[in-house]
UniProtKB/Swiss-Prot annotation:
Family: Belongs to the argininosuccinate synthase family. Type 1 subfamily.
Subunit and partners: Homotetramer.
Compartments in which it is found: Cytoplasm
Name assigned to this protein: Argininosuccinate synthase
Domain of life: Bacteria
Binding site for ATP: A11, Y12, S13, G14, G15, L16, D17, T18, S19, A38, G119
Residue numbers binding L-citrulline: Y89, S94, N125, R129, S180, S189, E265, Y277
Encoding gene (name): argG
SUPFAM superfamilies to which the protein is assigned, alphabetical: Adenine nucleotide alpha hydrolases-like (SSF52402), Argininosuccinate synthetase, C-terminal domain (SSF69864)
Gene Ontology cellular-component annotations: cytoplasm
Catalytic activity: L-citrulline + L-aspartate + ATP = 2-(N(omega)-L-arginino)succinate + AMP + diphosphate + H(+)
EC number(s) on file: 6.3.4.5
Gene Ontology MF: a single term: ATP binding
Length: 401
């Protein structure tokens, strides 16, 4: 049977789904499978991946270090926007998928592949993030979405475990502990198994990059973070590359029990899902960045920018990273960051990330104006007319009652 697919590039993680998909693609399409794994900070999850992909049936595998690009071009732009989804989620997985899909398309072009493939389920957000990126960057490329393919005969993860065992496919997880985890420089997410019950407390053994607050040190840790135009550039005076800064900040914050989130979120496809996240470094950087802006950003600019945070987060969460409205929104955000330069001192203690100091050469804060002591620059009597003018509509409304 001629499927029209001779060569496909698969976004490969070595997890249950993509491990099975390699063999399934070969059986179903009779095609060559090129695996692509992006190093976005998942560390030990990449160990043995090359041998495993080839053993499973891939003709070759690309394993590329994209950590710097991920931090610089995806995490930091979202940080400049203070992006947070539904007031809780710092978008760790959402930001990684467009980068992985972009590089996957580039490899497909270079290899002359007919199609790209991913292992995201038909119920989740990642399918949308991958496929919107494919279409935005290579409109005519064929997309094989395994879970939505009519030839996909697996009904559950149990079916996939059976298939993997039949074909001697090694897996990083077991039937007894089938949590789905996704790790990068910004976070690690945990889903599935007992976590599907929103009443069940997450077991401590799922946490990977953060201590529990109870186990964190009894003394606080202080860290100073330098920013330049909204981007973190140094910790305690030592300049670091974007990826190195994220890694070190994760270590410091994780050791102090910071960044654990347990939330029920609204997926783009319409259902709710429960996710448990560890975002230690990102949690501290987000708080520090906002603290710096409190010094340097004009009030009305801040009000306007803050009104756009939910929209920015929604676009990123829903997979529209390469949409024209996202490009326009990022340009506006970056305009607000031109003077977001300075240093913020953070106190980290048992799960708490506390701002205890901030300074900037562009600070709009003036002790002369803000002091409660006697000053020479502000006549408090001027406030009388200001208040009466602002109360005018309230007084008129009261008179008409």
């Amino acid at each position: 049977m001629d499927t029209g697919v001779k060569k496909v590039v698969l976004a490969y993680s070595g997890g249950l789904d993509t491990s099975v998909i390699v063999q399934w693609l070969i059986e179903t399409y009779g095609c060559e499978v090129i695996a692509f794994a992006a190093d976005v900070g998942q560390k030990e999850e990449l160990e043995g991946l090359r041998e495993k992909a080839i053993k499973t049936g891939a003709s070759k595998i690309y394993i590329e270090d994209l950590r710097e690009e991920f931090a610089r071009d995806f995490v930091f732009p979202a940080l400049r926007a203070n992006a947070i989804y539904e007031g809780t989620y710092l978008l760790g997985t959402s930001l990684a998928r467009p980068l992985i899909a972009k590089r996957q398309v580039e490899i497909a072009r270079a290899e002359g592949a007919d199609a790209v493939c991913h292992g995201a389920t038909g119920k989740g957000n990642d399918q949308v993030r991958f496929e919107l990126t494919y279409m935005a960057l290579e409109p005519n490329i064929r997309i094989i979405s395994a879970w939505k393919d009519p030839n996909w005969h697996f009904k559950s993860r149990e079916d996939m475990f059976d298939y993997a065992e039949k074909h001697n496919i090694p897996l990083p997880l077991t039937r007894e502990k089938p949590y789905s985890s996704d790790r990068n420089l910004l976070h690690i997410s945990h889903e599935g198994a007992i976590l599907e019950d929103p009443w069940a407390e997450p077991p401590e053994d799922i946490f990977t990059i953060s201590l529990s607050p109870e186990a964190a040190p009894d003394k606080p840790t202080y860290v100073e973070i330098d920013f330049e135009q909204g981007n973190p550039v140094a910790l305690d005076g030592a300049r670091l590359s974007p990826a190195a800064l994220m890694e070190k900040m994760n270590d410091i914050a994780g050791a102090n029990g910071i960044g654990r989130v347990d939330m029920v979120e609204n997926r783009f496809v319409g259902m709710k899902s429960r996710g448990v996240y560890e975002t230690p470094g990102g949690t501290v950087l987000w708080a520090a960045h906002r603290a710096l802006e409190s010094l340097t950003m004009d009030r009305e600019v801040m009000l306007m920018r803050d009104s756009l945070i939910p929209k920015y987060a929604q676009l990123a969460y829903n997979g529209f990273w390469y949409a024209p409205e996202m490009e326009a929104l990022q340009a506006l955000i970056d305009e607000t960051q031109k003077k977001a330069t300075g240093t913020v001192r953070m106190k980290l203690y048992k799960g708490n990330s506390i701002v205890v100091g901030r300074k900037s050469p562009y600070s709009l804060y003036s002790e002369d104006f803000a002091t409660f002591e006697k000053d020479q620059v502000y006549n408090q009597m001027d406030a009388t007319g200001f208040i009466r003018l602002n109360a005018l509509r309230l007084r008129i409304a009261a008179m008409k009652k």
